[in-house]
Amino acid sequence: MMYPYMTFEDGTEVVHSDLIVDGDIEKVIVHFERPTAEGFDSARCELPSYNWTMWEGRFTDEEKRGFETFLSNNAHLLYRYAANGGAKVA
């Protein structure tokens, strides 16, 4: 299951998975998606390795660096929310 986390000013949606246990590693999948005239720009990153598993559309290298900074700054919260079934928002 994927849970909403944040929407950036340009319309990019950030969602994350449940906590995934793979052997002795706890993982979270984070997906970035932005609507375009042709469909979507999409990127997916796996934490804690910061491995990009999908990159489609027209996100720029600068945006990718921004996503990596965002992930680094938010990883602790993404893990917390993933373990608890998403952020609880009223």
Regions from the language model: what does each represent?
Residues 1-20:
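Negatively charged, low-complexity tracts enriched in Asp/Glu with abundant Ser/Thr
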Residues 7, 13, 44-46, 88:
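Ser/Thr- (and often Asn-) enriched beta-sheet segments in non-cytosolic proteins
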Residues 5-6, 31-32, 65:
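Intrinsically disordered, low-complexity segments enriched in polar/charged residues with Gly/Pro
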Residues 16-59:
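A short, structured beta-strand/loop element
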Residues 55-90:
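Acidic, low-complexity intrinsically disordered segments
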Residues 3-5, 50, 79-81:
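Sequence-level detector for tyrosine residue identity
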